[in-house]
Amino acid sequence: DDMGYGDCSINNPESKILTPNIDQLAKMGVRFTDAHSAAAVCTPSRYGLLSGTCPARTDINNFTAGRGPVIDPDEITIADLLKEQGYATHMIGKWHLGFEGGRAFDFSKPLTGGPLDCGFDSYFGVNKAPSSPPYFYIRDREPVAKPEGSIDGNEGKGMDRREIYRKGEAAPGFKPEEITEVMCHEAVKVIRDYGESDKKQPFFLYYALTSPHSPWLPSEKFKGKSEAGNYGDFIVQLDDEVGRVAKALKETGLEKDTL
């Protein structure tokens, strides 16, 4: 999310950020060197990816922080299509396509209008980027914990201004710097649950990372791993998480049966 074309070392031999796991994926598959997004920000790019509709042909042409669901109930998503073909469909990560009620979450009832209403069988993730409240994880249609507490936020200064996350409501124990690690754990769990069971049903996993969208908050063990400051270190962490997902596919024997 917000990653630049030249941030991957395979696209930029002079990059100060090494991304061996992403590079390996590129070497094993197809690399598009002249591909263009119909929209360069959060909501429309995700809308186009899931619906197949060019966002410029709709009113979904900018990011949305407070509107309701942007995917209409009668729209067909890639998850819907695969479900019709017998796939189990799972999503992990950043949704940012709205829930019923927009900004006004009503936690007295299930959260509707999200992934489970757009073709996915299961969901774990966050409503949007971890730069503004409310901060909480969602599993299927329920908050893992309601945002009944708060965090102070981080102003960010100078070259580190993209460390910023705003003060506001947060679920108990929610830490913005842990989001990518939590998401990776959930994605690997989905893969291992299939690979280590006798399930014969094919599955689709949409793994929508929040990083390297701000706030740039690499874990301690990744700090200083690049020559491009916190942003570069954050991408090194992202690359490591891509490697962990690839490793799970390999260790479960699913790598050879994966598109």
Where are these regions (language model features)?
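Formylglycine-dependent sulfatase
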Residues: 2-259
